[in-house]
Amino acid sequence: FRNHTTEIYQSIQHDNNILSMDIPADTEIDFEMPEGEMNHHCFETIEDICQITTPNSILEIGFRRGNSALMWLINSSATLMSLDIDDFSVKSVQLLESQFPNRFQYLQCDSRTFKSKKIFDLIFIDGDHSFEGVEGDIKMSLQLNPKYLVLDDYFHGDHHQDMYKIISQFDLEIIKEYRTHQGQVLIKNKLRK
């Protein structure tokens, strides 16, 4: 699977509107990331999360250039729906749609107004990092009743205390914390069996 992915992405060039990672022919994952974006340590985190959760369907809140979307698609066989309020990532969306035609879908929308009847096993939250934004994304996510949530930037100095308060507020169970990049946290939805 990674060999196929390597062939697809080895020629991608970095610019502001397309995936900013290169996967060389030797299948080693190599990332060229602007400061503040997900890097190769995050790839290992997402790989671990996929091994723990074995998701069939993932919702991603916050797409940006599509780096994390690609990581979810490489590390799982799940379908992935990505949401973002902005439209600056058109080339990345087109590339992922063409290479993962039955697994990837992108919706440009505000997560606060997102509604779906689809069931998601895992929801990855990396959108609005304000207290109200994270709280709203978790509240919306819990209405979709996923098995797991993942919060990005969990250990970021500006967000950690807020995220911890929100996790406590919704009585969510922390499964694992990842101290890579700005950190991620894997959370179990205790209400879904």
Regions found by a protein language model. Give the residues of each.
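A short alpha-helical cap/connector motif
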Residues: 1-124, 128-193
